[in-house]
């Protein structure tokens, strides 16, 4: 039995906290919303994110960052990408020893184009950094929390950290594979959100299976091109952290990114869609990062470019689809 602090009280952090508690670990969650914390401590629920799920009664929550930091030596960073750097810096100020950091964020930082493990590494001083890893793959929180069979990948530059993640989370409904390609696993998780928004647009516009299959296939090609340029193993994108995550995010109404795209395809603006959803949609920020990163690296990413125009330049979705279909002739 290990003590683990979960930073963030969103849907996935809550679902994974439940997994850890059911695996016999002592779990403390940290969040900023007092009502969420009180609800979890009193009723063992987090209705804002997993409205019908009854959580393990051993899970506790706090708004006290220092209490959360001192509670354990293993930190699960279940925060949106844009919050990772700030919270990591705040944590570092309170540390007196090395900690292991496991993140589940799927994004790329806007200004630096850094992956989440790099953001944590930047923010945590070397004397406090006991290793950084990621848990990623096709894993909707709504299914994990009700013990639907789920399979994910754990990755780190340190194989001992990958194995620790595997040992902490694996049980009879959550299977965890280790993967030594940290770059590929992180990029696969982040970049698929772009394609998921585009997939939702296609569905929202009423296009059929042919268009959806084409989008996912060509989307995977984009992900692989950029990933390989950034040092990832192309084979990673054929695994759980790549095509596995891509399929589940591009085909499910559980996916926030797909849902946003669907609303865009129906004619709503991004602002209108987000107002309805009231949730963080990582793919928006990732689209912005990857659009500029691809230009910097000289990597062709037409789907990403088209989505960037829709989200940030107010180009109609119908025009973007037409632009993609009318591109110059090419070999596959």
Curated annotation (Swiss-Prot):
Organism field: Staphylococcus epidermidis (strain ATCC 35984 / DSM 28319 / BCRC 17069 / CCUG 31568 / BM 3577 / RP62A)
Function: Catalyzes the reduction of the glycolytic intermediate dihydroxyacetone phosphate (DHAP) to sn-glycerol 3-phosphate (G3P), the key precursor for phospholipid synthesis.
Gene: gpsA
Positions contributing to sn-glycerol 3-phosphate binding: 106, 137, 139, 192, 245, 255-257
Domain of life: Bacteria
Catalytic activity, as annotated: sn-glycerol 3-phosphate + NAD(+) = dihydroxyacetone phosphate + NADH + H(+); sn-glycerol 3-phosphate + NADP(+) = dihydroxyacetone phosphate + NADPH + H(+)
Residues that, per the record, bind NADPH: 11-12, 32, 106, 141, 256, 280, 282
Molecular function via GO: glycerol-3-phosphate dehydrogenase [NAD(P)+] activity; NAD binding
EC number: 1.1.1.94
GO biological process, one term: phospholipid biosynthetic process
Tagged with keyword Nucleotide-binding: yes
Chief place of localization: cytoplasm
Compartment(s) of residence: Cytoplasm
Protein name per its UniProtKB record: Glycerol-3-phosphate dehydrogenase [NAD(P)+]
PANTHER family the UniProt entry points to: GLYCEROL-3-PHOSPHATE DEHYDROGENASE, GLYCEROL-3-PHOSPHATE DEHYDROGENASE [NAD(+)] 2, CHLOROPLASTIC
Key words of the record: Cytoplasm, Lipid biosynthesis, Lipid metabolism, NAD, NADP, Nucleotide-binding, Oxidoreductase, Phospholipid biosynthesis, Phospholipid metabolism
Pathway(s) of this molecule: Membrane lipid metabolism; glycerophospholipid metabolism
Cellular component GO terms held in the UniProt record: cytosol
UniProt xrefs under InterPro entries: 6-PGluconate_DH-like_C_sf, 6PGD_dom2, G3P_DH_NAD-dep, G3P_DH_NAD-dep_C, G3P_DH_NAD-dep_N, NAD(P)-bd_dom_sf
Catalytic residues (positions): 192
Similarity comment: Belongs to the NAD-dependent glycerol-3-phosphate dehydrogenase family.
